[in-house]
Amino acid sequence: DPADEPASELLGRIREQRRKLDAEGKAKLPKGGESVIFCGSDGRRYEKWVDAKGRESELVCIEDEIPFEIPDSWEWARLDSICDLVRGSGIKRSDIVDEGLPCVRYGELYTTYETSIDTVASHTSEAVFDVSKKLGAGEVLITLTGENNIDIGRAVFNATGETLAFGGDLLALKGKNVRGDYLAMAINSSVVGSQRTRASTGNIIVHLSATKACRFLIPVPPLDEQRRIVERINEFVTLITNQ
């Protein structure tokens, strides 16, 4: 839709907000500065890094990383330039109780949830909940440990409307200017799936480091387009499910 705010303005707003929070001591910019990806005059994609003082690194051509062309109103962005990443800490099996506060353990992203957490399967005590990392409504979790390099790094977003505690081997993606449902779908797509596989290590037990997850290249549409994409995918899923 030509009336949509371009993703370049959305990303610019994210960078401005993060620099403000960094200046106030409420957040830290990514190590080495924030990634900015743009199309050069030669039509190729370049990346630079801008630190808190506005100093820019040398340009690096990343055209070989771009998997396909996107509409003019879209942008490519590194995962850590559109959201803050927070690692979880252990909620053990023995910490799970029948009644308590909602929590998520990494194995449940493989066995219980598809692309969203609609109803929480596990609960823990108030004591464990209070010291655990938290996932806000609409935020995303990805797995850092798995059994193969295809499923590793798969994502779900929190659709419960509640704050959830989350355990170790999980990475929370926290961003207010990108839809969590779109981001989870993008990460689970083949576009990011191939990046997840290449970034993984190990055979019997497969791992994905938060440092490598930060570098995932994400196609970012305007916010309204993100909503339309999610709605259309959900329509197709409903049709397939009801067949």
Q: Predicted segments — roles?
A:
Residues 1-58:
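Extended, domain-scale alpha-helical bundle/helix-rich regions
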Residues 4-13, 17-20, 59-89, 219, ...:
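Non-catalytic DNA-recognition/assembly elements of restriction-modification systems
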Residues 53, 59-65, 80-93, 107-139, ...:
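Sequence-specific dsDNA recognition surfaces
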Residues 65-70, 127, 171-175, 214-220:
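Short, well-ordered beta-strand elements within core beta-sheets of diverse protein domains
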Residues 105, 127-188, 202, 207-209:
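A short beta-sheet element
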Residues 106-110, 212, 233:
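Short, small-residue-rich loop/turn micro-motifs
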